[in-house]
Amino acid sequence: MSAAPGLLHQELSCPLCLQLFDAPVTAECGHSFCRACLGRVAGEPAADGTVLCPCCQAPTRPQALSTNLQLARLVEGLAQVPQGHCEEHLDPLSIYCEQDRALVCGVCASLGSHRGHRLLPAAEAHARLKTQLPQQKLQLQEACMRKEKSVAVLEHQLVEVEETVRQFRGAVGEQLGKMRVFLAALEGSLDREAERVRGEAGVALRRELGSLNSYLEQLRQMEKVLEEVADKPQTEFLMKYCLVTSRLQKILAESPPPARLDIQLPIISDDFKFQVWRKMFRALMPALEELTFDPSSAHPSLVVSSSGRRVECSEQKAPPAGEDPRQFDKAVAVVAHQQLSEGEHYWEVDVGDKPRWALGVIAAEAPRRGRLHAVPSQGLWLLGLREGKILEAHVEAKEPRALRSPERRPTRIGLYLSFGDGVLSFYDASDADALVPLFAFHERLPRPVYPFFDVCWHDKGKNAQPLLLVGPEGAEA
């Protein structure tokens, strides 16, 4: 039996334009297309020079496309069959086979391969199938909409990737640039110090060398005198011996002490590298925020200076708190005027020898009335000192987490906040040239937040020391 009528036409049709092949080419995966159709659909080659097969998505090289002469000859032969007639029997295609979804002639339907199939007159099949087109069109439109959304999402993600990479490269370049500037300045400073030491040591050593050479010359002269005296007659020998030996003893007594030069240069060790890292850490911090305390938020017992950069707890009886929800009525605390909501920020607070305090940030929506529960879930991220020696982080727990006691109690605290990285870090900033990490919260903070300062109760004068905000010119006295 020959192939079913219509199936040959289907097999010789391009899967892209659904028409008979025109200049058919075959890809490496085995699928065939009109050359023009493939060029239109495949688009520009990828980085490796390949295009994707529209049927199976397999990569194929455009230069490997081969003209399919056998297909071309079959198409040419099929084109000679009158349109609407069976390729095998040349009879009109008047019957529709539902089972094979193909038009067939009467001979194929009654005697050929479609005998016994579900068959309909072509006119009836046309009317029935035409009613199904709107539903199929709707399905096609819905599929297009879904794919268009997918395309939009991918295009947006592509833009996001480009922007993320651009920002990453910018941040890397900026930070590494700062590191290079810092290290170049440090290298220059150390080189100048080494040159200074070399110069001073050279002058001192040359001075010592001149003195020693002069003394050595005296010793050699005395050696010659002794040799001359040894050859003298008895009387002259005895007369000169006492003079010569007396002079020799005087010269020996004036012997210059051995040179002792103390060269003061840093020892290049792991500790040196650690010190450089700490100094570089400070150099990479953003510029100091110029914060001021917000008096309207301060507990009634707190006194804020006219400059807004000094706050202390008064030992005088405080008036009752007002009704302003922005004011702390139980916690002896205050926030900064400035709210922070994006980017990087760094500020410093002089705590001096104050034995109790807490610093950090508070969410703008966090309550300020009543007793504060100082944990992140309540909008507070704090580091504090108690009893003058115990640093503690106010983490999500019943009690604050006590940290390892530092070698020395910090007198100045540095706080670094990065919304992009989701980090709030605390540092011992007592050394003007270096920062020592103390603790860090790693989480995405709500926006905005306010710098928070818990001055704590004065404790009958034991904790009366102020908190001072540090500006570019230093802390207020």
UniProtKB/Swiss-Prot annotation:
Changing C242S: Disrupts oligomerization and membrane translocation upon peroxide and saponin treatment. The keyword Disulfide bond applies. Changing M179A: Monomeric; fails to translocate to membrane; reduced cell viability upon peroxide and saponin treatment. Zn(2+) 4 binds at C97, D100, H114, H117. Pathway: Protein modification; protein ubiquitination. Disulfide bond formation at Cys-242 occurs in case of membrane damage that cause the entry of the oxidized milieu of the extracellular space, resulting in homooligomerization. A zinc finger (RING-type) spans 14-57. Zn(2+) 2 binds at C29, H31, C53, C56. Changing L190A: Monomeric; fails to translocate to membrane; reduced cell viability upon peroxide and saponin treatment. Homodimer. Homooligomer; disulfide-linked. Oligomerizes on the phospholipid membrane. Interacts with DYSF and CAV3. This is Tripartite motif-containing protein 72. It comes from Homo sapiens (Human).
